[in-house]
Amino acid sequence: MSKSRLTVFSFVRRFLLRLMVVLAVFWGGGIALFSVAPVPFSAVMVERQVSAWLHGNFRYVAHSDRVSMDQISPWMGLAVIAAEDQTFPEHWGFDVASIEKALAHNERNENRIRGASTISQQTAKNLFLWDGRSWVRKGLEAGLTLGIETVWSKKRILTVYLNIAEFGDGVFGVEAAAQRYFHKPASKLTRSEAALLAAVLPNPLRFKVSAPSGYVRSRQAWILRQMYQLGGEPFMQQHQLD
């Protein structure tokens, strides 16, 4: 290998190592800070806002109203757990059984990819990372998830998740969603309304709370059944998530 190529390789390696250190400090500091401090915005919110501006849409506003868990209906927390991650109180960030099922499904159905991200993983991804699918992003997501699970309580993870989750075009967080779609605060959401909001979470830009399709209604009904099977509202109290 020539001297010039060695020099370039060495420069790139040093640059990447320094970048990794900077990102580790940035993300580690963010995890520590947001364990107690309110989250002002998420990476997904920034990405959506910048994308809108770049496409000339200056009327778009990524809107979120931060609320604490005692300002959120317990039905809402139960609904997202029933819909997205039923082992949330027990796992350390990853649901191995769901991952194995998703891998088996994806091998059989290449055109219908199924995910297995837990609420903890989704929180890490939405808060700190860019959208998309790659092994690099998945690796970073795994590291951030472990950091969040180590430092934050389960209640804190669920609170942040509910405050940054996307429920529609420009609608981030359960308070903004409750006001937009039901004209009430998140604390007043009913069991059925919470299940409907949770039903669009797989793809909130495709599935609409304001105009639910047959699939969304079917998923809402399934979520309601799962909420009942989990034990209803006492489930949240039992796991100290309310």
UniProtKB/Swiss-Prot annotation:
InterPro entries documented for this protein: Glyco_trans_51, Lysozyme-like_dom_sf, PBP_transglycosylase, Pep_trsgly
Pfam families xrefs: Transgly
Claim: Transmembrane is one of the keywords in the record: yes
Protein localization: Cell inner membrane
Transmembrane segments: 19-39
Keyword Cell membrane appears in the UniProt entry: yes
Pathway: Cell wall biogenesis; peptidoglycan biosynthesis
Membrane topology: Single-pass membrane protein
SUPFAM superfamilies: Lysozyme-like
Keywords from the UniProt entry: Cell inner membrane, Cell membrane, Cell shape, Cell wall biogenesis/degradation, Glycosyltransferase, Membrane, Peptidoglycan synthesis, Transferase, Transmembrane, Transmembrane helix
GO CC entries: peptidoglycan-based cell wall; plasma membrane
Catalytic reactions of this protein: [GlcNAc-(1->4)-Mur2Ac(oyl-L-Ala-gamma-D-Glu-L-Lys-D-Ala-D-Ala)](n)-di-trans,octa-cis-undecaprenyl diphosphate + beta-D-GlcNAc-(1->4)-Mur2Ac(oyl-L-Ala-gamma-D-Glu-L-Lys-D-Ala-D-Ala)-di-trans,octa-cis-undecaprenyl diphosphate = [GlcNAc-(1->4)-Mur2Ac(oyl-L-Ala-gamma-D-Glu-L-Lys-D-Ala-D-Ala)](n+1)-di-trans,octa-cis-undecaprenyl diphosphate + di-trans,octa-cis-undecaprenyl diphosphate + H(+)
Any single GO BP term: peptidoglycan biosynthetic process
Broadest EC class assigned to this enzyme: transferase
Annotated EC: 2.4.99.28
Gene Ontology MF annotations: pentosyltransferase activity; peptidoglycan glycosyltransferase activity
Function per UniProt: Peptidoglycan polymerase that catalyzes glycan chain elongation from lipid-linked precursors.
Family: Belongs to the glycosyltransferase 51 family.
Record-linked HAMAP family: PGT_MtgA
Record protein name field: Biosynthetic peptidoglycan transglycosylase
Organism name: Escherichia coli O157:H7
Native organism taxonomy: Bacteria, Pseudomonadati, Pseudomonadota, Gammaproteobacteria, Enterobacterales
